[in-house]
């Protein structure tokens, strides 16, 4: 039996930035620009700016939490500290679903691009894998598992090597496409042919939110970082600002480089005609060398992300077990390697599972985006509640303006959930309500030593209220097969008012005293 150990503090600020930027520049930039263009036209560039601004607000909140409480898997331990085990359990479930499926998305992206050279990997006329294509995905998952199984240092070194190449390619693409830029493309059918609704759709379902995934991995490895009180806030802010700039420029140069005659079919056709956008546009422009470079990067970028997310997810499973609402075996850390091997095995198994029901990149990205934003939404809530029930907590990074940034960031996360539409919200939030009922049915076995079940329920009703509110608004709203009873801007006003009320409800119904586990 492996000896129990502790996580090793071996990650520097540079490692953190590489992890954050690596998590952001995975498969999303290789697919999202054509999706965004098809939903928002030239105004899609503003989707990246607005999405980056929203993530920056949430990132500032995480910076305070991560610096004050540098915990491995912190993103699903903070809600336990502020609101108890029931809230932590619900957030843990949706976060693990999101991250295990993310690993699958990345290997699926690799297979779809490699199929350009080896068509036998993908079923003709679809994005689904053949048997050999699925075997390739499985082999990649095995590789990520082994890289993380042996040690934290092995993971960091592998991430560094991959990162060097994956950052060069987007910059090269930007430089090359500038020389093919056609300004008139920015006014075809108007700058914003679908209005603000198109920008909203691009953010929630076009891949914008999916692209900004660098927050969780940085916070999840907080317990393994050198000088976390300084390095976590710096890494978060740098990653968000730099990625927003690069994504926006990539979107503009892609739109500008599309041959103008191609746009005669309308913006919605761009998503179909450029399913592998940067490879397709390189071929269309006669830049075979660039197409080859993009495909090589399409193998390394998602591959590097899969490696990062395998690492991150194992830490999240570990944190869930530490919360007391998952089997204790998953809270064990190998003494020799500093890795939670049991958690890694579970992450590996779940990542294999998700390759089965969701065979393509587009099939999973919307669900993952909403699941991730639901896990992001807890950050401003926990931070606000901890300012009430943990006033003496040392906060090396004290976020000024929390009274404004906290409510705003929560409202924006609610907007993104709403924009994803009834089709996605119904089953995702519905499953959360089912998990709530399961927790109550098995409450005999849930942790109650520090916080009674009655107090856990009192501190969790706001979350159930939020889920029910979003289900109602999504059902009567106009996004994703809603009934269309309410439309813009009335729907957003109602969501904002309801979310603001729930924010303050959650802030003042946290635990009477924060249940902080000072054993990292």
From Swiss-Prot:
Record-stated family: Belongs to the amino acid-polyamine-organocation (APC) superfamily. AGT (TC 2.A.3.11) family.
Stated name of the protein: Aspartate-proton symporter
Further remarks about this protein from its record: Allows enhanced growth with L-aspartate as a sole source nitrogen source.
Keyword Repeat annotated: no
Native source organism of the sequence: Bacillus subtilis (strain 168)
A GO MF term: symporter activity
Principal location class: membrane
Keyword Transmembrane: yes
Alphabetical UniProt keywords: Amino-acid transport, Cell membrane, Membrane, Symport, Transmembrane, Transmembrane helix, Transport
GO biological process assignments: amino acid transport
PANTHER family per UniProt: ASPARTATE-PROTON SYMPORTER (PTHR47547:SF1), PTHR47547
UniProt signal peptide: none
Compartments reported by the entry: Cell membrane
Function: Uptake of L-aspartate with the concomitant import of a proton. Can also transport aspartate hydroxamate and L-glutamate with lower affinity and efficiency.
Bilayer-crossing regions: 13-33, 49-69, 85-105, 130-150, 161-181, 201-221, 232-252, 281-301, 345-365, 366-386, 402-422, 425-445, 460-480, 482-502
UniProt xrefs under InterPro entries: AA/rel_permease1, AA_Transporter_AGT
Listed Pfam families: AA_permease_2 (PF13520)
GO terms under cellular component: plasma membrane
Membrane topology: Multi-pass membrane protein
Induction / repression: Induced by sucrose.
């Amino acid at each position: 039996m492996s000896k129990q150990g502790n996580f090793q503090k071996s990650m520097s600020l540079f490692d953190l930035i590489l992890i954050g930027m690596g998590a952001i520049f995975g498969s999303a930039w290789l697919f999202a620009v054509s999706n965004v263009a098809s939903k928002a036209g030239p105004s899609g560039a503003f989707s990246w700016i607005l999405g980056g601004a929203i993530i920056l607000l949430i990132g500032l909140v995480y910076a305070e939490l991560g610096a004050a409480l540098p915990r491995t898997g912190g993103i699903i331990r903070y809600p336990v500290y502020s609101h108890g085990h029931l809230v932590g359990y619900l957030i843990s479930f949706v976060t693990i679903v999101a991250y295990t499926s993310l690993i699958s998305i990345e290997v699926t992206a690799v297979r779809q691009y490699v199929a350009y050279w080896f068509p036998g990997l993908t079923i003709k006329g679809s994005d689904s894998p053949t048997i050999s294509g699925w075997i390739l995905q499985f082999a990649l998952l095995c590789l990520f598992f082994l890289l993380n199984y042996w040690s934290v240092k092995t993971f960091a070194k592998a991430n560094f090597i991959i990162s060097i190449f994956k950052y060069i390619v987007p910059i090269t693409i930007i430089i090359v496409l500038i020389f093919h830029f056609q300004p008139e493309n920015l006014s075809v059918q108007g700058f914003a042919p679908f209005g603000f609704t198109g920008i909203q759709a691009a953010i929630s379902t076009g891949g914008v939110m999916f692209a900004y995934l660098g927050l969780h991995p940085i916070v999840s490895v907080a317990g393994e970082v050198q000088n976390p009180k300084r390095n976590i806030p710096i890494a978060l802010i740098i990653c968000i600002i730099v990625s927003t700039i690069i994504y926006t420029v990539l979107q503009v140069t892609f739109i500008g480089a599309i041959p103008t005659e191609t746009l005669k079919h309308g913006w919605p056709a761009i998503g179909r005609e450029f399913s592998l956008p940067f490879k397709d546009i390189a071929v269309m422009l006669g830049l075979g060398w660039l197409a080859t470079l993009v495909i090589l990067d399409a193998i390394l970028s998602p591959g590097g992300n899969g490696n990062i997310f395998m690492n991150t997810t194992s830490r999240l499973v570990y944190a869930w077990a530490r919360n007391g609402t998952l089997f204790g075996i998953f809270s064990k850390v190998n003494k020799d390697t500093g890795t939670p091997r049991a958690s890694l095995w579970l992450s590996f198994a779940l990542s294999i599972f998700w390759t089965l029901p969701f065979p393509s990149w587009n099939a999973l990205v919307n669900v993952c985006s909403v699941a991730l934003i639901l896990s992001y939404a807890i950050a401003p809530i926990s931070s606000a509640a901890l300012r009430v029930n943990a006033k003496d907590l040392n906060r090396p990074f004290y976020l000024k303006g929390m009274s404004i940034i906290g409510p705003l960031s929560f409202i924006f996360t609610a907007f993104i959930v709403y924009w994803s539409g009834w089709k996605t919200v119904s089953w995702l939030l519905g499953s959360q309500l089912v998990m709530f009922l399961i927790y109550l049915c098995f409450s005999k076995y849930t942790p109650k030593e520090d916080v009674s079940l009655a107090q856990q329920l009192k501190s969790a009703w706001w979350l159930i209220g939020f889920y029910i509110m979003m289900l109602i608004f999504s059902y009567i709203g106009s996004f994703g097969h809603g009934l269309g009873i309410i439309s813009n801007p009335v729907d957003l006003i109602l969501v904002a008012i309801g979310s603001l009320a729930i924010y303050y409800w959650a802030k003042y119904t946290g635990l009477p005293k924060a249940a902080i586990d000072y054993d990292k």
